[in-house]
UniProtKB/Swiss-Prot annotation:
It comes from Archaeoglobus fulgidus (strain ATCC 49558 / DSM 4304 / JCM 9628 / NBRC 100126 / VC-16). This is DNA-directed RNA polymerase subunit Rpo6. Its main location: cytoplasm. Part of the RNA polymerase complex. It holds the Pfam family RNA_pol_Rpb6. Keywords: Cytoplasm, DNA-directed RNA polymerase, Nucleotidyltransferase, Transcription, Transferase. GO terms for biological process: transcription by RNA polymerase I; transcription by RNA polymerase II; tRNA transcription by RNA polymerase III. It comes from the Archaea. It catalyses: RNA(n) + a ribonucleoside 5'-triphosphate = RNA(n+1) + diphosphate. Its EC number is 2.7.7.6. Belongs to the archaeal Rpo6/eukaryotic RPB6 RNA polymerase subunit family. The gene is rpo6. InterPro entries: DNA-dir_RNA_polK_14-18kDa_CS (IPR020708), Pol_omega/Rpo6/RPB6 (IPR006110), RPB6/omega-like_sf (IPR036161), Rpo6/Rpb6 (IPR006111).
């Protein structure tokens, strides 16, 4: 199973790049934007969404056990 860790925690630079890149691709392919913004570039929008903590994603890290990182809170 694993351990669930809630925010605050630090993503690695690789996790951050993967999350923002994947979200930017989704936005470029027509996915709805999760925030109100004036920006038009998918990468800039994804970065702003990441900084606000609204991207619904769970990161799975491999340590001695699996660690699940959840940053968003939808409810």
């Amino acid at each position: 199973m694993g351990i669930k860790v809630k925010f605050p925690f630090e993503y690695t630079r690789f996790e951050k790049a993967r999350i923002i890149g994947a979200r930017a691709l989704q936005i470029a392919m027509g996915a709805p934007v999760l925030i109100e913004t004036d920006k038009t570039e998918p990468l800039e929008i994804a970065l702003e969404e990441f900084n606000r903590g609204v991207i619904p994603i769970t990161v799975r890290r491999r340590r001695n056990e699996f660690v699940w990182l959840e940053r968003y809170d939808l409810f």
